[in-house]
Amino acid sequence: MPGTHTQGLVKKQTLTEAEANAIEQLITLCNYYEGLHMRLDVGVLRHGSGNETNDFLYYEDGILVGYLFVEGWGSRDRELTGMVHPDFRRRGIFRSLLTTAKEVCQQRNAQKLILVCEHFSQSGLAFVNALGAYHEYSEHEMVLGTFRERRNVYKGLHIRQANSSDLDAIVSVLATDSGNVESVNRWVAKLFEEPTSRFYLATLDQKPLGCLRLDFMSDQVGIYAFEVRLGYRGLGYGRQMLEEAIRAISAETQKRIMLDVETDNTNAIGLYLSCGFEIKTTYDYYGLIIS
């Protein structure tokens, strides 16, 4: 009917350009209102797979006032990031978004939701506490300032871009700590299909020693899944991997380079600081069992 406006909650598998633009505006508004750095890349949202319902939008008289994004590949956990327009809070909008997303995740046999809350977001913290969610861990987001490289080269260590034939080698590295080979395998296989994602494999005397993943986003490049096998840590291999990744990124783009690190991983934080990374903000992750 002419003149009608979208109202209430809308579930989407693929976003239109107008929807993505509205989400971007909402992110900017919420960030400004609380002085935050919302953990959502609109460039990624614009190119969603379209195979699953991961976007939940809430409208008031045609205006987007709430948004929730669900992410999770190959795992029983689903990571949720969302926001509500400052003028429309305390009206149950985010709870409605979360309830609907929870139902969709349960249909996919998810067992747990992980809610991402920036450490300094008073509204987010109040909400997760009201839900009864429990704190799982926290991460610093670190951004590269002035790159301080050493260019140490270790004999026998080779670092190269990986392809799908390296899937088993990468999984063997990433599953060292968790032991969940099947879940990691699904997750890595999915990431190999993503055009913005690129894995690198490090081998020592032709044996898999470590890996990392580059994620090329709209305004920055993230370094993720950075792992060195136990027994080879603290020997300089990780630093060489990180330096080569930074040089590869810098040769291709001038975008900002960032990475995440758990706040209690003091050794990794020390490495990143020594390479020129600086802490930008901190995110807290809260678990909510739904199975």
Describe these PLM feature segments.
Residues 1-42, 153-181:
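Short amphipathic alpha-helix that is part of the acyltransferase structural core
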Residues 1-5, 74, 86-155, 286-288:
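Acyl-donor-binding surface of acyltransferase catalytic domains
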Residues 90-103, 130, 228, 234-251, ...:
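Conserved acetyl-CoA-binding loop-helix of GNAT-fold acetyltransferases
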Residues 28-31, 35-99, 103-105, 117, ...:
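Conserved donor-binding loop and adjoining core beta-sheet/short helix segment
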Residues 182-248:
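Glycine/small-residue-rich hydrophobic helix-like segments
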Residues 114-125, 230, 258-269, 285-291:
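Conserved beta-strand-loop-alpha-helix junction that forms the acyl-donor binding cleft
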Residues 81-90, 226-234, 262:
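A short, internal acetyl-CoA/4′-phosphopantetheine-binding micro-motif in the GNAT/acyltransferase core
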